[in-house]
């Protein structure tokens, strides 16, 4: 972080010393002062409230003090402030998107000698789709705005009507790390540096690099749950908009969780490709053609027909398929591919301890997988009862995961699959492990000092939705490291 940038965390109250620039403000928190991105924070609704009110846990809307007309009038004013903030930030955001689409995307398309369509898609993602959706959303908000009595405005329904549209942010957020990598590569060449700077100046945009502008949609989708929570706080339970705001808050939290989950899943595909490349004698299509998540893994005894011969195999349950491998007799860290089962065509049946009527052998901690198309069955036995139960629960989770993916439309593109397999092959060639880290979504940008001329205000730092940790390597860590 630059020496002049202000360090802070979610929940801090920052005193704004200068807000002349729309993108970067100068502020003070505790004993430190410095620049911070304005888009990372939001203004407190009531500037007259002491900061302690925000640092303490805030009560819900139903617990607010509604006694007396003065208290209600104050609450109405604070609801008006929240509504004005929502509309103001949306209008600013629309201008920001328009500047990117007209100032950068349109100009880049004119230079076919510098940019291919694939490059433009990598750099800008689906930002033009986001721009179109946001314009419709702002129009709907303005239609619901009560100009004479703003506190009576009913904005909750707008969020509910457009909640499906916000899911397009998932594609943008997942692509953003690729955009940063491509921009970093291009800006090593002076002609691209000059071109991007010319685009910024012609559009009269502030002095921030393009990757800084492209970060805004990632930040924006995280703001909606916070704004709606603030709106709900100052909405009386008897207000006509109360139930809609409550439902909208829940819906936008789900959207944020969906985006985080999709991002987590896409971060896993490189690891899955690396795992596949470590398996000897792999046959058939790549794992990523149908799967993107390791759900469970472990050692099971496979009892085969017709002699009821038992085999120790390592099983890996992914969404839509179950892979089984054989350990090398001498090198136990090496696995050989032995086959796969299509989970879409299997029925899992619990088998009681005792003599199996099909194979006429005694089994314990067993379950059977029936194949609907071929009529084949696979008898598998765990060592302990609790291991068997974990497998049965994992099979149920796998079916639920597939159902959710179908409902939300989650899928891995052909380009993402190819890139993951290419990365895995490169790593295998070098023999060096590739670090898989979290993309730098919160990249800092340096800016020159700005004159202080704005009255002091206080802002509350945004708390972004927490990202669900991946359990891929947690599952893998229970096994020996698989490397050639």
Curated annotation (Swiss-Prot):
Where is it predominantly found? cytoplasm
GO (cellular component) term, any one: cytoplasm
SH3 domain residues = 1-46
Which Pfam families does the protein's record reference?
A: RhoGEF (PF00621), SH3_1 (PF00018), SOS1_NGEF_PH (PF22697)
InterPro entries according to UniProt: DBL_dom_sf, DH_dom, GDS_CDC24_CS, PH-like_dom_sf, PH_domain, SH3-like_dom_sf, SH3_domain, SOS1_NGEF_PH
CDD domains noted in UniProt? PH_Collybistin_ASEF, RhoGEF
* Residue ranges, annotated region (Disordered): 51-75
A molecular-function term among this protein's GO annotations = guanyl-nucleotide exchange factor activity
The answer on whether this UniProt entry bears the keyword Metal-binding reads no
Q: Where is the DH domain?
A: 78-262
Keywords recorded for this protein, A-Z:
Cytoplasm, Guanine-nucleotide releasing factor, SH3 domain
Hey, what tissues is this thing expressed in? Expressed in colon epithelial cells. Highly expressed in CNS, including hippocampus, olfactory bulb and cerebellum. Expression is aberrantly enhanced in most colorectal tumors.
Outline the extent of the PH domain.
Answer: 293-400
Source taxon at top rank: Eukaryota
Q: Which SUPFAM superfamilies is this protein grouped with?
A: DBL homology domain (DH-domain), PH domain-like, SH3-domain
Biological process terms from the Gene Ontology for this record are: filopodium assembly; intracellular signal transduction; lamellipodium assembly
* Protein location: Cytoplasm
Q: What is known of its domains?
A: In an autoinhibited form the SH3 domain binds intramolecularly to the DH domain, thus blocking the Rac-binding site.
Its biological purpose: Acts as a guanine nucleotide exchange factor (GEF) for RHOA, RAC1 and CDC42 GTPases. Binding of APC may activate RAC1 GEF activity. The APC-ARHGEF4 complex seems to be involved in cell migration as well as in E-cadherin-mediated cell-cell adhesion. Required for MMP9 up-regulation via the JNK signaling pathway in colorectal tumor cells. Involved in tumor angiogenesis and may play a role in intestinal adenoma formation and tumor progression.
Instruction: Share what the entry says about its subunit structure, partners included.
Output: Interacts with RHOA and RAC1, and APC. Found in a complex consisting of ARHGEF4, APC and CTNNB1.
Spell out the protein name for this chain: Rho guanine nucleotide exchange factor 4
What organism does the record attribute this protein to? Mus musculus (Mouse)
């Amino acid at each position: 972080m630059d020496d002049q940038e202000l360090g802070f965390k979610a929940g801090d109250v920052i005193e704004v010393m200068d807000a002349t620039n729309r993108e970067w403000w100068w502020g003070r928190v505790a004993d430190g002062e410095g620049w911070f991105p304005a888009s990372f924070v939001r203004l407190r609704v009531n500037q007259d409230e002491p900061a302690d009110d925000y640092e303490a846990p805030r009560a819900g809307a139903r617990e607010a003090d509604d006694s007396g007309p003065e208290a209600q009038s104050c609450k109405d004013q604070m609801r008006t402030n929240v509504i004005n903030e929502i509309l103001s930030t949306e209008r600013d955001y629309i201008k920001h998107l328009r500047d990117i689409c007209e100032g950068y995307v349109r100009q880049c398309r004119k230079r076919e000698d510098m940019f291919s369509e694939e490059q433009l898609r990598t750099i800008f993602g689906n930002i033009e789709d986001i721009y179109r959706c946001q314009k419709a959303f702002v129009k709907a908000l303005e239609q619901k705005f009560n100009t004479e009595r703003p506190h009576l405005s009913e904005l909750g329904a707008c969020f509910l009507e457009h909640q499906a549209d916000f899911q397009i942010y998932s594609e943008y957020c997942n692509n953003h790390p690729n955009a940063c990598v491509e921009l970093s590569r291009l800006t090593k060449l002076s002609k691209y540096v000059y071109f991007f700077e010319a685009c910024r100046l012609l559009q009269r945009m502030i002095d921030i690099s393009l990757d800084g502008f492209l970060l805004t949609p990632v930040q924006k989708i995280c703001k909606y749950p916070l704004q709606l929570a603030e709106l709900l706080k100052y909405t009386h339970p008897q207000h006509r908009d109360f139930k809609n705001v409550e439902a909208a808050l829940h819906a936008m939290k789900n959207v944020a969780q969906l985006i985080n989950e999709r991002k987590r899943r896409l971060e896993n595909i490189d690891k899955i490709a690396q795992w596949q490349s470590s398996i000897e004698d792999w046959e058939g299509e790549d794992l990523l053609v149908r799967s993107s998540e390791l759900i469970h893994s472990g050692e099971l005894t496979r009892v085969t027909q017709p002699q009821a011969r038992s085999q120790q195999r390592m099983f890996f349950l992914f969404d839509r398929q179950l892979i089984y491998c054989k350990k090398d007799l001498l090198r136990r860290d090496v696995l050989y591919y032995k086959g796969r089962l299509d989970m879409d065509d299997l029925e899992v049946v619990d088998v009681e301890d005792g003599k199996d009527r099909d194979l006429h052998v005694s089994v314990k901690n067993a379950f059977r997988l029936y194949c609907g198309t071929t009529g084949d069955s696979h008898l598998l036995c765990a060592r302990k009862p609790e291991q068997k139960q974990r497998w049965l629960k994992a099979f149920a989770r796998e079916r639920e995961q597939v159902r959710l993916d179908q409902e939300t439309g989650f899928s891995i593109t052909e380009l993402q699959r190819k890139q993951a397999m290419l990365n895995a092959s490169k790593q295998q060639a070098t023999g060096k492990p590739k670090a898989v880290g979290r993309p730098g979504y919160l990249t800092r940008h340096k800016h020159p000092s700005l004159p202080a001329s704005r009255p002091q205000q206080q802002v509350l730092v945004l708390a972004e939705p927490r990202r669900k940790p991946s359990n891929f390597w947690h599952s893998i860590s229970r096994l020996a490291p698989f490397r050639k």
